[in-house]
């Protein structure tokens, strides 16, 4: 077998490979040299560290932002919730507006410059948020952090380019795991480090944001030193230069793109809905259909969910994907969703009727089973790669998907928590209405999977990187 020498990469190299040459249809041979595979997975590990910074920056302020608004801006207690909702959402709204421009910039400048610039800007702006002394400054720094939203789209495509069909499922499992880790660590930093006194007594909310920023700066330096540019000069050929630009409209008209974007968005909406409501549900008293947990048990269940997700994503998903494929996993997880929601309601009923032994058997089992639906999001990452009409369209397609997710992250939590709160005013069994609505949305998702494109059902199609 002929071994082609690796091409030298720099920051001005084309972002995505041409369709000419080996693997010109986007298909990468499964065989990869062990040394090259080890190097690629090292790159994936670094990129996953970068992936964790976005949710870390997003969620760090959640434990203290309400008190910060009341203390810093002098807002009436009755109005704090309104302003905190705006400040929390501004990150995602700004990110949504600039996601596609960041992808375009990466097409022109290369992956690595956009990654480093985004990470550095996100880290610094997140750190400065804790030093805000007015409501206007809080809004400004939150929007500034969202402006540097190019990290996620760049990391997602670079992971695709650093993996082969054999390693892609595991790589995107790590990608999803990194998001989970950032989501868990962010609130822990915010809750544990705010109002420490001492040197921070004049800025009581600065320490957690500085800590989050320090994480970001550390990862930025590591990526600057060790992450390789994935856009190689050899990939940029006259064929690619002469090919038409892949505009957003042209990508949307490509076969299979619209169904996959919708299914991805629908899956994320379900995830955001449950993630937002679950802490409130755990806190709600059993007489209103909740679990009535103390903060300790709430954190125990949330932490247990994170551990269970880690096991499902890292140990279960890669071999399961190899055996069943993306489409079958998505359909199977819709069934798991229904069982999980029914078991959650069943556990609540047991608690309400003081059947505590049965409750403590069913509730943890439901939690572990329900955590498996995190694999749905990893499967959708692979589906996006599969429907990309061209290597040159992959960055923009991912940016479009992430823009949709940013919008949902901005509006879904408030929408579904308000819905859940309104159902608590109903008489029994009306306070279980929210779970019926969520189950209905799962059935809609299962129905839309009928339009899952054929190429998603098959083995992963590789768009970014080739091996001889």
Curated annotation (Swiss-Prot):
Pfam families from the UniProt entry: MFS_1
Gene3D superfamilies attached to this UniProt entry: MFS general substrate transporter like domains
Membrane topology according to the record: Multi-pass membrane protein
Keywords from the UniProt entry: Cell membrane, Glycoprotein, Membrane, Transmembrane, Transmembrane helix, Transport
SUPFAM superfamilies linked: MFS general substrate transporter
Carbohydrate-modified residues: 228
Cellular localization per UniProt: Cell membrane
Induction annotation: Expression is under the control of the azaphilone cluster-specific transcription factor azaR.
One GO CC annotation: plasma membrane
InterPro entries: MFS, MFS_dom, MFS_trans_sf, Tet-R_TetA/multi-R_MdtG-like
GO MF annotations in UniProt: transmembrane transporter activity
Bilayer-crossing regions: 43-65, 80-100, 112-132, 135-155, 174-194, 207-227, 257-277, 296-316, 329-349, 357-377, 387-407, 429-449
Protein family according to the UniProt entry: Belongs to the major facilitator superfamily.
Function: Efflux pump that might be required for efficient secretion of azaphilones.
Protein's name in the database: Efflux pump azaK
């Amino acid at each position: 077998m002929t071994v082609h020498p690796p091409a030298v990469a720099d920051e001005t190299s084309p972002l995505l490979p041409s369709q000419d040459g080996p693997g010109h249809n986007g298909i990468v041979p499964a065989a990869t040299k062990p040394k090259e595979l080890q190097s690629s997975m090292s790159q994936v590990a670094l990129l996953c560290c970068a992936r964790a910074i976005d949710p870390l920056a997003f969620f760090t302020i959640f434990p203290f932002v309400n008190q910060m608004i009341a203390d810093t801006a002098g807002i009436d207690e009755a109005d704090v919730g309104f302003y905190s909702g705006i400040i929390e959402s501004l990150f995602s709204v700004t990110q949504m507006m600039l996601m596609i421009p960041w992808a375009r910039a990466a097409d022109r400048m290369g992956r690595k410059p956009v990654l480093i610039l985004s990470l550095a800007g996100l880290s610094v702006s997140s750190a400065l948020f804790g030093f805000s002394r007015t409501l206007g400054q809080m809004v400004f720094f939150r929007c500034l952090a969202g402006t540097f939203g190019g990290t996620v789209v760049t990391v997602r495509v670079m992971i695709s380019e650093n993996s082969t069909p054999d390693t892609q499922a595991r790589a995107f499992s790590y990608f999803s795991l990194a998001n989970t880790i950032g989501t868990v660590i962010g609130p822990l930093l915010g809750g544990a480090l705010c109002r420490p006194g001492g040197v921070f007594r004049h800025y009581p909310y600065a320490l957690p944001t500085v800590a989050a920023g320090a994480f970001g700066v550390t990862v930025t330096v590591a990526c600057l030193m060790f992450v390789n540019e994935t856009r190689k000069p050899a990939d940029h050929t006259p064929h690619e230069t002469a090919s038409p630009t892949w505009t957003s409209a042209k990508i949307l008209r490509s076969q299979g793109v619209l169904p996959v974007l919708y299914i991805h968005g629908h899956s994320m909406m379900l995830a955001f809905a449950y993630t937002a409501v679950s802490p409130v549900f755990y806190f709600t008293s059993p007489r209103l259909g909740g679990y009535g947990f103390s903060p300790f048990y709430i954190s125990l269940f949330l932490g247990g969910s994170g551990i269970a997700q880690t096991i499902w994503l890292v140990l279960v998903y890669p071999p399961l994907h190899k055996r069943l494929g993306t489409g079958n996993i998505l359909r199977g997880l819709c069934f798991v969703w229904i069982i999980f929601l029914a078991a959650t309601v069943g556990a609540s009923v047991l608690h309400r009727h003081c059947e505590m032994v049965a409750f403590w058997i069913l509730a943890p089992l439901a939690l572990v089973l329900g955590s498996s639906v995190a694999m749905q999001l990893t499967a959708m990452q692979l589906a996006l790669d599969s429907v990309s009409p061209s290597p040159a369209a992959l960055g923009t397609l991912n940016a479009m998907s992430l823009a949709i997710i940013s919008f949902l992250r901005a509006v879904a939590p408030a929408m579904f928590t308000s819905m859940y709160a309104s159902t608590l005013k109903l008489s029994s069994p009306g306070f279980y209405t929210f779970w019926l609505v969520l189950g209905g949305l799962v059935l809609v998702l299962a129905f839309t999977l009928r339009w899952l494109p054929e190429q998603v059902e098959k083995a992963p199609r590789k768009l970014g990187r080739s091996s001889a």
